[in-house]
UniProtKB/Swiss-Prot annotation:
Keyword Secreted listed: no
Protein known as: Small ribosomal subunit protein bS18
GO terms, molecular function: small ribosomal subunit rRNA binding; structural constituent of ribosome
InterPro entries in the cross-refs: Ribosomal_bS18, Ribosomal_bS18_CS, Ribosomal_bS18_sf
Pfam families, sorted: Ribosomal_S18 (PF01084)
GO annotations of cellular component type: cytosolic small ribosomal subunit
Gene3D superfamilies: Ribosomal protein S18
Coiled coil: none
Species assigned in the record: Bifidobacterium longum (strain NCC 2705)
Entry's family note: Belongs to the bacterial ribosomal protein bS18 family.
GO BP terms: translation
Keywords for this protein: Ribonucleoprotein, Ribosomal protein, RNA-binding, rRNA-binding
Function (record text): Binds as a heterodimer with protein bS6 to the central domain of the 16S rRNA, where it helps stabilize the platform of the 30S subunit.
Length: 82
C-alpha cells in the first residue's frame, strides 16, 4: 500500500513575447542578416522556439531563411567548440 505524495500546485508558465511581432516584421528574408543573427546562438546553431518565443510557422520560415543565408555565405555554419 503505497500512498502518493501530494503534488505541489503547478505554476502556469508565462508565454514569451514574440520578438518578430514586437519588431513588426511581416516577412522573413534570408538577406536580412541582422534579424537572423538574433535567432542563432554564438556557435552558429539555430535557437529553438522554446528559447526564442516564435510560432511554429515563423520557426519554419526562420530555419529556411537561415539555411538559405548560410548557402549564400551570409551567415556561418555551426562551429565546433575548439
Amino acid at each position: 500500500m503505497s500512498r502518493k505524495r501530494p503534488q505541489p500546485p503547478v505554476k502556469p508558465f508565462k508565454k514569451k513575447p514574440n520578438p518578430l511581432k514586437a519588431a513588426k516584421v511581416t516577412e522573413i528574408d534570408y538577406k536580412d542578416v541582422a534579424l537572423l543573427r538574433k535567432f542563432i546562438s554564438d556557435r552558429g546553431k539555430i535557437r529553438s522556439r522554446r528559447i526564442t518565443g516564435v510560432t511554429v510557422q515563423e520557426q519554419r520560415e526562420l530555419s529556411k531563411a537561415i539555411k538559405n543565408a548560410r548557402e549564400m555565405a551570409l551567415l556561418p555554419y555551426a562551429t565546433s567548440g575548439r
